[in-house]
Curated annotation (Swiss-Prot):
Mg(2+) cannot be replaced by Mn(2+). Optimum pH is 8.0. Homotetramer. Signal peptide: none annotated. It comes from the Archaea. It catalyses: oxaloacetate + phosphate = phosphoenolpyruvate + hydrogencarbonate. Allosterically inhibited by L-aspartate and L-malate. PEPC activity is not affected by allosteric activators of E.coli PEPC such as glucose 6-phosphate, fructose 1,6-bisphosphate, and acetyl coenzyme A. Optimum temperature is 90 degrees Celsius. Is extremely thermostable. No loss of activity is observed after incubation for 2 hours at 80 degrees Celsius. The times required for 50% loss of activity are about 60 minutes at 90 degrees Celsius, 10 minutes at 95 degrees Celsius, and 1 minute at 100 degrees Celsius. This is Phosphoenolpyruvate carboxylase. It comes from Sulfolobus acidocaldarius (strain ATCC 33909 / DSM 639 / JCM 8929 / NBRC 15157 / NCIMB 11770).
Amino acid sequence: MRKIPRTMSTQHPDNAKVPEWNQGEAISGENEIIEAYLAFSRYGVEEVMWDAEGKDVDTHVVRKLLSQYPEFFRHRILGKDIFLTYRVPNPKIEGAERKVFAETLNTIPITYDLAEKFYGENPNPPVFEVILPFTTSYEELIAVIKFYEKVIVNSDNTKLVDDTYVKDIIGETNPKKIEVIPLIEDRDSMLRIDTIVGKYIEIERPPYLRVFLARSDPAMNYGLLSAVLSVKYALSRLSKMEKIYGVKIFPLLGVGSLPFRGHFSPYNVENTLNEYRGIYTFTVQSAFKYDYEDDLVISAIKKVNGTNVTEKIELSEEDEEIISNVTRKYTQGYQNKIEALADVINKVALLLPRRRARKLHIGLFGYSRSTGKVTLPRAISFVGSLYTIGIPPEIIGLSSLSKMTDQELNAIFNNYKYLKNDLQFAARFVNFEALQLLKDIWNIDAEVVKAIKEDIDYAENSLGIRIGESDYMSKKHVLLSTLALLSIKEGKLDEAKTYIKEMAIVRRAIG
């Protein structure tokens, strides 16, 4: 059995600070090669995600890593000890990126040839897995592996002229097969994960399967509680599928540093491991790496790598049904408020620091994220916007718990172990003065502000969460939030950007 990595470095642009080796405010181009190397060598991460989704990507990454850092990669074998995993665009959803999907898969045999030259005959393929975002059906997964086999590998035997075949021109194509990792990003797909993962296993019978569960996008689209509980539901179903099909399943979880996006920070590693039992691989995003002291980051990653994976969560069918109902109920109260704040969120998002040279992801070229009836920025900008206006997104929707039954509340507290811990972190940054400024600057309806205050009241009075803290950093963040909003009100956007960046540094993440 191959090694399954415990940590995966990603290129998510959630870092408030820029690492010292990067020139400029955004990480791009050659610096992403340096970043991948440092993830392995400095931080001890076991896998790097190479992201071709929604951004320009260097398809020569393996060539550059092996040629620029030969000593390191001779001792740590790519594809055996450490791993590089492509995240490809989903051609079904991202129409403008279809050819990028094909281009990325076509580089896999090139990486094999490079490894053969570097390591010798029959090397471990340096790239043999791809992550498929927005997976909603088993057919999408099968299409990826069949595209690789039929279009790329089988083209070896295509006759060109007389006795000349494709393989005579470009050489034999290896590896012969690739593995696909479904990335499940929406609540409904998590709640019917059997029809995606189960059906795929039934048809393809893989020796094992890695399944990637998102935390950020479900939180943005359905609210914090719905996201956490959907993941717990999916983990329970995966545990049962392992037994049904006799195939080992290794779940990955896409987590950021702030509670809304997973609360996987160097300070909270222990809690995250306990919260998400059965997860094999956690994403180490940019804020984790660059907004904390290096020694803290390195020791946290070492801890995760060295911790044994606990048994997967397995719920009774009754509990699964209750959780499914809770996620739908919670979403309704959450989405109504987000729809009312969408215009503000989108405007404030434009003022946040840019940390990656991403291509446009709103409009024609790429995608934005839709919640209910509105379009929102990507999850990091969404979270950053709400923290900026003094309404941490973790709080939004909480008052809907007052309408839950005792059975439903028990399901929430039993299955979201660190709910209060996560809410307490976020509640430090609530800014009451900002609620009034929302009405003054953007004419937000008084009923919406009242509904958000109800969420805050529920957190304080029913859950015992302290709103606001007296420590220096919490008070500084609240003050900066007020200054940022006053700057926007006066049209002083450059000043607002300065305050917004300072706030991100205080909370150690953009969003």
